[in-house]
Amino acid sequence: MRRIWNNLTSILLLPALFTCICLISCSQDTTTENQRSAYYWSTTWQMDSSKMNFIQKHHIKRLYVRFFDVVRDADGEIMPNATLQFDTTDENMTVEEKEKESLMPKGMEIIPVVYIVNDCFKANTKTNPISSDKSGRKSSDETPRQLADKILNRILQMNEANDIENVKEIQIDCDWTASTKDAYFEFLHILKEKAKDKKIQLSATIRLHQLSMTPPPVDRGILMMYNTGDVKQLSCQKPILDMKDVAPYIQHLGNYPLPLSAAYPLFSWRVLFREGKFVGIMHADDDFPVLPSDSIVVRKPEMSDIMEAVRSINYQNEDINREVILFDLNTDNIKRFKSEDYEKIFNHRSDGSSI
């Protein structure tokens, strides 16, 4: 397992790509502006001209970049998976980009994100359960401390291998529940202290159902304003974002003890149903065999849904929208709406003007 965690030969990306990212030379004075950010959630880094233009046009200065997942393999071992790979071809670059040797605008802040499957924190798996360091465990069990060490070291190694400098924050994404809270929180506490030694802050995603529970021991949270309904139900028309589902969870945001930012959805799903029953989400046409009698439905948030969510968050706690994050920076997602619509999201106003 150590070889897999430490083997970075397959993830040596283009050092020159991130060298330009880390050059701190902003052309605009953004001291009085709210933070504009986006997630980059993919297994392949492809910063083509359309994404670059979107970033520059909307003055996005921070990217939350998914580095890798952490999952259990078939033997129950906790392992890294789906590590971010860069597209090393030149076909996505314009002549100007090649000449400038720049795939990103200057001044971009990168926040590495690691997604951890909740099963990694369940203690009742057949092998290698992760459990509290204080619990009675076998000597071969994975512990929160060991996992924190491995994840932080892997992030730091990826940063170094790809010339990603000046990283001030890392983020953990996990759909934790009451049954995994203790192990997950202990892991976060340890990781926070280890990151602090490197002068790095720790943030974590916060799902709506987690708002009613004790906040995780991190420096700040990102409230995920999406995946609010049951995509497996054909009758659920708005599984990505429906304020009827959101409203009960956000009533007490003003008293939430952890500093928050909010992430809003741009993505859509193509969902396959067979005889009214959920088959899966189709990310590609060949993900599932499609029968003539099957139904493929498209689920996506409309601009009105997103703006209702933005206004609702403003009403509950306007400080949350001091940083607006789009999920995610995908070529299709950034073409869904007009340019002025994205400005409305960032500016928190339906008329597109700044607050």
Where are these regions (language model features)?
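Chitinase-like catalytic core of GlcNAc-active glycosidases
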Residues: 31-33, 37-40, 69-71, 75-223
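Boundary/entry segment of secreted carbohydrate-active catalytic domains
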Residues: 26-55, 60, 66
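Bacterial N-terminal signal peptides that target proteins for export
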Residues: 2-13
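Short, acidic/polar
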Residues: 44-56, 144-161, 210, 305-314
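Conserved, mostly hydrophobic/aromatic
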Residues: 63, 172, 221, 262, ...
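Substrate-binding surface in catalytic domains of secreted glycosidases
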Residues: 186-274
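Substrate-binding cleft of secreted/luminal carbohydrate-active enzymes
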Residues: 267-269, 275-355
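Bacterial N-terminal signal peptides
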Residues: 11-22
